[in-house]
């Protein structure tokens, strides 16, 4: 059971498929918004119960696959001009924040509850598994001392402090949230150099691929 918008391998396979379809089938789309349909949680990251039952090899390959999905988001921006925005409305922790880190621009609703966090080390005694530390320091240019504090505490960072620490790009009051997200998406779409009138490439159906190529059982 996936609670708090957590994800397992199946969810990430579908996400990876969606990223490729948006990139190659829809040249008219210049910006994509990652958001949650739930008000109080953006994404809690990988499902802990699933990981607790998994073998070491499964965990390693799961982390590799999820990181490749995040890399594919960044690659779609760098090489295909399709920009991604993360609209964080609620708790955004662990792999959920690592997903947001793959986006060009991170927006955080400033409602005194929503926050971003990488709590794996204090809670589970492990390092973030899908590029969180690297993207915090190398991509977002968070100061090393602040990154150390951020990754060693359970509590997430909210509002203006998250902006000051460079963990997100902007904190938006709830009253302006919907309009600001729409405006920012339009702004990034206008920057895109994707050919609006081009013909997309139809990709094979995901289920058809799985049926044609049986997966080995670990």
Task: Please report, for each region that a protein language model flagged, where it lies by residue.
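CoA-thioester-processing core
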Residues: 93-148, 181
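Intrinsically disordered, low-complexity segments enriched in small/flexible residues
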Residues: 1-35, 139-158, 165, 169-218
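Conserved helix-loop functional segments at active or binding sites
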Residues: 21, 71-79
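A short, small-residue-rich loop immediately preceding and capping a beta-strand
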Residues: 80-92
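Terminal peptide-recognition signature
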Residues: 14-15, 34, 47, 69, ...
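Glycine- (often His-adjacent) and acidic-residue-rich active-site loop
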Residues: 2, 36-71, 122-125
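Short, well-ordered beta-strand core segments
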Residues: 84, 106-107, 171
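Short, active-site-adjacent cap segments at secondary-structure transitions
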Residues: 39-43, 93, 218
